[in-house]
Amino acid sequence: MSKIEKALKRAGDERGNLQLVPAAAAVERTAPWTALLGQQIELPETISRMGGNEGTLLSADELWERGIIHPQHTEEPAVQVFRELRTKIIQQSQGQNAVILVAPVSKGNGGSFIARNLGAAFAFDSAKTALLVDCNFKNPSVHRLLPDASLPGLADYFENPEIDISKIIHPVGIARFRAISAGELREIPAEYFVSMKMRRLIDSLRERYHERFIVLDGPPMSDIADARILSELSDYVLVVARHGRATNAQIEGGLSAISNKKLLGIVFNDEPRIPWRR
């Protein structure tokens, strides 16, 4: 059993209930989370149109090399954990699309690992699409998922008033999954996230596909100003802490920047790679 799964399982084994945070600083959750199984959902036209521009899809082994789960590995604990995270968010949002900020407590806590796999889990569902946005300008990673790491991204969108949003959204080799990299960073202006252009971007990304779930790969919560701004732009926040490394003071300090109404919970992560058996 992976450390991620253990952390989630410790919070409660009651059938249909998933608690992410076994910590005193977390907000208690009482809403029942019921798995969405066996539903017959008509494929939206927007998803059908997306299917024509997927690029070359990656195999399960190729995704493994990139640290991404694959739905074929149905018996692997990590796959089930991310499915449960996805189900919790879908239940919380009452089936509507949502913007989820994934924020590590500090650098090296595995936030990008959680963010990309949460996005992949949404894309597992044939009635959903996912978009991963790299908002961690000091330590970007999403460009590694793209067919060409030099493709334009978020910084290019802010710097170039002529660039269209569609030019920064790229396939990553997974059906129904797209990504926006950090882009070419000449500097890291503090005003990027507070600009109206950022808010308009998030609104546009949300409205473009009503079945799209947007995952923001956020900066560490030690960058409290950016974390607070991005949390205000998001519907929900998922905090990531590396088990045995993040201190209670760090976790509580990070949580102070987040509204209790938006906090989904904390994932305790201690696996740099997906721990399935070979």
Give the ranges of each region predicted by the language model:
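P-loop NTP-binding module
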Residues: 1-278
